[in-house]
Amino acid sequence: METILSLKNLDKRFGRVHAVNNLSFDIQKGNVYGILGPNGSGKSTTLGIILNVVNKTSGEFSWFDGNLSTHQALKKVGAIIERPNFYPYMTAIQNLSLICKIKEISTEKIEEKLKIVNLFERRNSKFKTYSLGMKQRLAIASALLNNPEILILDEPTNGLDPQGIHEIREIIQKIAKNGTTILLASHLLDEVEKVCSHVVVIREGVKLYSGRVDEMSASHGLFELNTNEPKNKLISILNNNSNIGSVREEGDLVVAYLTTEMEATDINNYLFKNGITVSHLVKRKPSLEEQFLDLTNNN
């Protein structure tokens, strides 16, 4: 499979701030990738580096299996990394025509791209009459004008109402089905889960996970426990079990994440032998949100 983008040991410092820390991952053709992390985790900085907007401190990245220079490769890239900025008194057609002129590309695809983002009926409306969601959709249309092989989006639904969020996500999925590779940055786990096939989880510039979204939630499960004994005693004994990767308190319960397969009867016997009688014991699969929190809290 063709590698659209490859990052190797990418690093960026802003003074004392280590924004991107030895980051490596590959983007394969035809997939939808999400860079997921809390605000300030280095997502936008990473996108800025690969788009030649931000200078890297060290490391390297290459486009299209290294066969093209960054300048040549960016002609095959569509990107939105800032708020949409169009002329308010110009129509959608006029604004996109101007972009085509600046990029020195044909205007023949304008109506096609407006249909993709569901703005064809408003093609002759002035930009100032658009809602925030419509403005974002027009920005996506502008990024598609050069028929890019990869579309890069930075927080594409940020600030939108639920309807606007739903529309943008549907458009992203539609574009992906047409064969365009997509890389988006988001702090919303729900967004990545619904839209992306692959995810790179980062925190403070460090990669915590890279792989398929569905494999991120594929684990050996977790135990929810409670006891009348002191909680710190239960937690200490659980932490001493080699089958358990991490333990944390959630309200009245103690949650233990498994690293290998283990049945409820096994953990019950183990605790009983160590002087703990449980009043509540349930085994279940963790949600993607719980997996994400476990990653970010324990790395």
PLM regions: where:
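ABC transporter nucleotide-binding domain
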Residues: 169-255
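Short, charged/small-residue-rich alpha-helical element at the C-terminal edge
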Residues: 222-295
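Structural motif detector for alpha-helix initiation sites
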Residues: 92, 213, 285-289
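ABC transporter nucleotide-binding domains
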Residues: 2-5, 12-184, 189-203, 207-209
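C-terminal end-of-chain micro-motif
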Residues: 11, 297-299
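Residues that cap or initiate secondary-structure elements
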Residues: 18, 31, 106, 123, ...
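Short low-complexity, flexible loop/linker segments enriched in glycine and/or proline
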Residues: 200, 294-297
